[in-house]
Amino acid sequence: MGIQKLRIALKAYETSLLNDSCTQIINAVETGGVKAIGPIPLPTKRRIYCVLRSPHVNKDAREHFEMRTHKKIIDVYKPTDDVMENLRKLDLAAGVDVEIKSL
């Protein structure tokens, strides 16, 4: 019995890189003739950092910085060996973190 489902989780700080990577993965899966569901957007995580502007005085003067982590999931049902090989050959952007699980 082979793999029934692949879950591909993508994370990135920039939405444009994430969307481009999603389209590349979906195109690679669809060329193999396999059904893919997604990309399913997940909630965006926000990390906010508060930094003092001055090193010594003026505690009231502060700056806020935020990092947003965008996530998406793609489910691939009954992947074949050709699809797995297509996914391995993909060259995705450096700012995108890809995690693949077999379910």
Swiss-Prot record:
<comment type="similarity">
    <text>Belongs to the universal ribosomal protein uS10 family.</text>
</comment>
<dbReference type="InterPro" id="IPR018268">
    <property type="entry name" value="Ribosomal_uS10_CS"/>
</dbReference>
<protein>
    <recommendedName>
        <fullName>Small ribosomal subunit protein uS10c</fullName>
    </recommendedName>
</protein>
<dbReference type="GO" id="GO:1990904">
    <property type="term" value="C:ribonucleoprotein complex"/>
</dbReference>
<dbReference type="GO" id="GO:0006412">
    <property type="term" value="P:translation"/>
</dbReference>
<keyword id="KW-0687">Ribonucleoprotein</keyword>
<dbReference type="Pfam" id="PF00338">
    <property type="entry name" value="Ribosomal_S10"/>
</dbReference>
<comment type="subunit">
    <text>Part of the 30S ribosomal subunit.</text>
</comment>
<dbReference type="GO" id="GO:0003735">
    <property type="term" value="F:structural constituent of ribosome"/>
</dbReference>
<dbReference type="InterPro" id="IPR036838">
    <property type="entry name" value="Ribosomal_uS10_dom_sf"/>
</dbReference>
<keyword id="KW-0150">Chloroplast</keyword>
<dbReference type="GO" id="GO:0005840">
    <property type="term" value="C:ribosome"/>
</dbReference>
<keyword id="KW-0689">Ribosomal protein</keyword>
<keyword id="KW-0934">Plastid</keyword>
<comment type="function">
    <text>Involved in the binding of tRNA to the ribosomes.</text>
</comment>
<dbReference type="GO" id="GO:0000049">
    <property type="term" value="F:tRNA binding"/>
</dbReference>
<dbReference type="GO" id="GO:0009507">
    <property type="term" value="C:chloroplast"/>
</dbReference>
<dbReference type="InterPro" id="IPR027486">
    <property type="entry name" value="Ribosomal_uS10_dom"/>
</dbReference>
<dbReference type="InterPro" id="IPR001848">
    <property type="entry name" value="Ribosomal_uS10"/>
</dbReference>
